[in-house]
Structures are given as structure tokens and as C-alpha cells.
Amino acid sequence: GRGDLPAPGGLSWAGELAALSGYEAATGYGLVTHYYNMKNGLVPPGAVSLCTAPDYVAMRLCGLEKPRTHASLAASLGLFDLDAGSFDHAALARAGLPADMLPEAVRGEALLGETAGGLPVALPIGDNQAGFLGAAGRPDDVLLNLGTSSQLSALCPPSGCPEGLEPRPYIGGARLMTGAGLCG
């Protein structure tokens, strides 16, 4: 992807964003793509916001003009502080990324609004989190998901996630520990 392309300083675009922000950054993170697009003049003039596809669909279903995002989707964009439950504005500034382009990150689960017909629309959650919730979800469960990518996920113990596994926001303020890789 674009994040793996070489940037002028010798690093990849993802590597440059990681060096500037202090956060892990890889192709696939929304802010890696946005960083590349900004640096290469590809952000349309007048663009006011970015969000994930599920956030956009939910926003449109509710007739809203500004997206909101669950922490599980916000974290997938990158430069997200898990402890604060928000994007890291200092890291965004170091990378030259305007914070006002990002959706509001919402802690917890909530109704986003209603459709024009009055049907409730919940704030979407990440696919890894939704898969764990639907297929496992109990404290001692482990979910192995194999597809184009693979994920091994379990709830983090109260003492914290072990090294080598990625902590991801989950529902109810909990975190999933996830090991992920490509299968194909």
C-alpha cells in the first residue's frame, strides 16, 4: 500500500509517521493513508473530515453531517491513546495532521441516532471486536478467525495484556489482546 512506498527521507511513509508520532504505524491504518495523501497533495480541497466506512454508513443512516466513532474503530485509524480513549493530539501535531479532520471518538457503546423512519442506529464497532462479541465474548473464550487475515483474540486480563499481543479497545471499557497476521 501507499504507506510502504518510500518517503523522501528514506523511510517509508508509515515509518516516517511512526517516527514523528511515536506510535506504531503500518499500511492499513487510516492515518497512514491520510498522511501519505496530505504529503502528496491528494486530499481534496475543502475536505472537512475523515472516518471509517462503518462510521460513514451509520452517519448517513442517521442523517448526520459529522461522524462519530467507537474507540475500536478510532484505534484502527492510528495515533489513538488507548488509556485516554481519544486521538493523541500532540502526536497528530508532531506529524502535521489536523485533529479537526478526525471523528469524535466515543467511549463506550451508544446509540448514534435514528433513521428517517425512526429505527435506532448504534455506533458501529470494529470487525475484530464484533467477531469476538458474536462468536465468543465470555472472559475465558479465545477466538481464532482465519480468512484473508488471521486473528487470535481473547479478553485482556485485569493485570494487562502480555507483550507481543496488540491491545485493542473492546466494549464495556475492556480490551482484547490480539495477535494478527496475513494468511494469503
Locate the predicted segments by residue.
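Glycine-rich phosphate-binding/catalytic subdomain of phosphoryl-transfer
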Residues: G1-G184
